[in-house]
């Protein structure tokens, strides 16, 4: 997690320019794990701290960068790509269908694209 100043650029080719000072989180997951590269340019979001956060810059093979704005985020905070998270405005949810709609595909393609590198957890195993 680091502060990106207004006007600074990040990512390959320095393609993303911050319009305001923002905390930016680097998340160790990318297209090799099943995050579609097209989310780079199609408004992809994840959940951190129970808020929707924009994926900024390019989805790379092993990481994404997420604009967290003014909110304080810390190393080790949970990041939800698909699923739900409690937040200050109630439960927020991102579904495979949300990404699919942005990418003009179907939810099954999103889910089937998640690679074996990503651990799977069921709600029951988390609660036990």
Predicted segment positions?
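Active-site anion/phosphate-binding pocket segments in diverse small-molecule metabolic enzymes
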Residues: 1-128
């Amino acid at each position: 997690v680091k502060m990106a100043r207004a006007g600074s650029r990040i990512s390959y080719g320095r393609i993303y320019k911050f319009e305001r000072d923002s905390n930016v989180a680097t998340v160790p997951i990318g297209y090799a794990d099943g995050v579609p590269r097209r989310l780079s340019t199609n408004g992809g979001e994840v959940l951190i701290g129970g808020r929707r956060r924009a994926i900024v810059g390019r989805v790379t093979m092993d990481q994404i960068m997420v604009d967290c704005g003014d909110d304080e985020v810390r190393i080790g905070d949970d990041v939800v790509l698909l699923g739900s998270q409690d937040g200050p405005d109630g439960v927020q949810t991102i579904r495979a269908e949300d990404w699919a709609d942005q990418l003009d595909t179907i939810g099954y393609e999103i889910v089937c694209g998640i690679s074996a590198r990503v651990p799977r957890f069921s709600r029951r195993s988390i609660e036990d």
